[in-house]
Amino acid sequence: MAALRQPQVAELLAEARRAFREEFGAEPELAVSAPGRVNLIGEHTDYNQGLVLPMALELMTVLVGSPRKDGLVSLLTTSEGADEPQRLQFPLPTAQRSLEPGTPRWANYVKGVIQYYPAAPLPGFSAVVVSSVPLGGGLSSSASLEVATYTFLQQLCPDSGTIAARAQVCQQAEHSFAGMPCGIMDQFISLMGQKGHALLIDCRSLETSLVPLSDPKLAVLITNSNVRHSLASSEYPVRRRQCEEVARALGKESLREVQLEELEAARDLVSKEGFRRARHVVGEIRRTAQAAAALRRGDYRAFGRLMVESHRSLRDDYEVSCPELDQLVEAALAVPGVYGSRMTGGGFGGCTVTLLEASAAPHAMRHIQEHYGGTATFYLSQAADGAKVLCL
C-alpha cells in the first residue's frame, strides 16, 4: 500500500496548457497555482474567532488563461468529480448586472471571486482549471480554486489589498455563491502557506505565526475515507448557529472570549446540546495553542495526544464525525510510530490527518486499509508554499 502519487506543479501546468490549447486554439499567457490545506488541529474554531493550525499541501489548483476583449469569461475545468457542464461562458458583472450563483457548482467559486474582486477594470478572460485537490475531501478544494482565481485576477488587474483583505474576498465568495458560511482559515492558508511550516492563525486578530514542520523523521499522512455524508452541508450552518447562540447567552461576542470555567458555571443558561458544542470549541482553542507550543519544541507525543483529544471532542461533543472517520482514526492509533490521528475538515466524511514517524508510514497505510471497511486513499504531503504566479 502506497500513498497516491501527487502530480507535481509542472505536470498540472502541462495538463492545463494542453487543455487550453485544445479549447481555445492558442497558448495561455498567464498561469497561477494555489494549494489545498490540511488542518492539523483547531477544527470548527475559525468561525468562532479561535485558533487554527493548518498547513498548505502539495495538492493544488492550477489555473491558466489569457485576457480577452469581448467582456466574456470562458471557463473549462478538467477536475475529476466537478459537476457538469465542465465548460461555460458568462459576461463580466456590471454596475447594473451582478453575477449570480447557478450551475455548474464548481464555477460559483470563480464567479464569486470575480463579483467581489476589488480592483477595476477587469477584462474578460479565457481560463482552464486543473486540480489535484480531491473534491469533497475536506482538503479545501474550494478555497484552493478561490485563491487561484484571485491570484489570476491580480495578473489581469492588480489590486492593492492586504493578504487578509484578499482572504476575506475569497471567503465572501464562498458565503454568497456557494452558500457555505465558512471561517477564514482555508483561504488564509492557501494564500500564506510557507514550505516547511504550519501556520498558527488567530481568526480574531488575523495575526499569523509560522510553526516549523520540516523534521525529515516526521510525516503527515492524510487518509481520505472516500465517503461524503449529506449532513455535511446541512449541519455546518446549524453548528455555527448553535455556537453563536451560546456566545450570546453568555454575553460574549464569540466563543473565543469564553473560558471553560465560565462555560461550566453557565451550564444552566444554555441547552445541553449547545453546551456540548461550546465545550468542544472552547477546549479546541486551548488545545490548538498547546499543540503549536508542542510542535515548536519538537514534542510530537504531546501533539499527538492533543490530536486524539480533538477527535474525541469532535465525535462526542460537536458530533461531526462518522463511523468511517472513527474507524480510520482507531486503525491509525494502533500502529507503532503513530503519534496521533484525528478527523480533519468539516466532518461527516472526508479525511483524517495522522502525525507519525516517517519510517512508520508504509505499515500505517497497510494497517489502516486492512482495518477499514471502505477503500481509503492516502496522501503523504510536506508543508508547502501558498499561492504563486507560475512561469510559462
Swiss-Prot record:
Swiss-Prot/TrEMBL site (Transition state stabilizer) positions: R37
Amino acids binding ATP: G136, G138, S140, S141
Annotated binding of alpha-D-galactose, by residue: R37, E43, H44, D46, D186, Y236
Modified residues (Phosphoserine): S230
Keyword ATP-binding: yes
Keyword set, alphabetical order: ATP-binding, Carbohydrate metabolism, Cataract, Disease variant, Galactose metabolism, Kinase, Nucleotide-binding, Phosphoprotein, Transferase
Biological process annotations from GO: galactitol metabolic process; galactose catabolic process via UDP-galactose, Leloir pathway; galactose metabolic process; glycolytic process from galactose
InterPro entries per the UniProt record, alphabetical: Galactokinase, Galactokinase_CS, GalKase_N, GHMP_kinase_C_dom, GHMP_kinase_C_sf, GHMP_kinase_N_dom, GHMP_knse_ATP-bd_CS, Mevalonate/galactokinase
Taxonomy, superkingdom: Eukaryota
EC category name: transferase
Active site: D186
Reaction(s) catalysed by this chain's protein: alpha-D-galactose + ATP = alpha-D-galactose 1-phosphate + ADP + H(+)
A cellular component annotation (GO) from this entry: cytosol
GO molecular-function term, one example from the UniProt record: galactose binding
Signal sequence, renumbered to the chain: none
EC number: 2.7.1.6
Any single Pfam family the record assigns to this protein: GHMP_kinases_C
Pathway: Carbohydrate metabolism; galactose metabolism
Function per UniProt: Catalyzes the transfer of a phosphate from ATP to alpha-D-galactose and participates in the first committed step in the catabolism of galactose.
Disease link: Galactosemia 2: A form of galactosemia, an inborn error of galactose metabolism typically manifesting in the neonatal period, after ingestion of galactose, with jaundice, hepatosplenomegaly, hepatocellular insufficiency, food intolerance, hypoglycemia, renal tubular dysfunction, muscle hypotonia, sepsis and cataract. GALAC2 inheritance is autosomal recessive.
Subunit structure: Homodimer.
Xref: NCBIfam families: gal_kin
Homology family: Belongs to the GHMP kinase family. GalK subfamily.
Name the record gives this protein: Galactokinase
Encoding gene per record: GALK1
